[in-house]
Amino acid sequence: MKVLAIDTSTYTLGVALLDGEQLIGEYITDLKKNHSLRAMPAIDALLKECEVQPSELDKIVVAKGPGSYTGVRIGVTIAKTLAWSLQIPLSGVSSLATVAASARYFPAYISPIFDARRGRVYTGLYRFENGELITVKEDQNLLLEDWCKELKELDHSVLFTGKDVLLHKETIIEVLGEKAIIGEASVHSPRPSDLGRLGLTAPAEDLHSFVPNYIRLAEAEAKWIEAQQGVEGRHG
């Protein structure tokens, strides 16, 4: 089964082509540039380099969020368009799970972190069991301090991954102490090949109803934060 994996949910642009579990080719850049101008050319270049025609693809896998609203939307739109035009299945995979997958050899919990501003993060909790990535706590948007207090109750150490971890390292260590392990650079970037493997057995989405998973705040909470920002602005 030839799978094309697409990840534009962070400023990492990743495209991978796999034949089952076997990686054929992979394209990754960590540039803060517009994915809308670069994603399709990257896909075209990868397919040509690997001498694979679009008609030979069996499945599309896309990082469905959370992450950059614009970035996630670009990837999902491209993936839906390709899947529809080629009449092949599309599977969406958590962008956080894709980052967690890079830490497959860590024996305990994995918490990928995307910054959501004002002390908040997008995160979830994962671990590997018999080589398979398992979701322990679903992806969510919450205050990092609250998340760390929640993790403090766990019986194992937690590996924090993702490029935004360094923005929050001080809070993580302050709350969790030695239970927190800050990942090395090798586990911070999402790899589209990991995304593709995660999506191999993922269920197919309904192309008409499939939308990005932005993990928006509950309306009441969002309004409260907006009101607080207004108060800060008047007194700033």
Question: What kind of region is each of these model predictions?
Answer:
Residues M1-P66:
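N-terminal beta-alpha supersecondary unit
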Residues C50-S55, F106, K152-H156, A202-P203:
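Glycine-rich phosphate-binding loop signature in dinucleotide/nucleotide-binding domains
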Residues V3-A5, V61, G71, I110-I113:
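Short glycine-aspartate micro-motif
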Residues G183-G236:
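Acyltransferase
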Residues L13-L18, V121-L125, N213:
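Short beta-strand scaffold segments in enzyme catalytic cores
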Residues V61-L90, S95:
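DPxDG-like acidic metal-binding loop motif
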Residues Q22, N34, P89-H188, E219, ...:
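Surface "functional belts" at beta-alpha junctions
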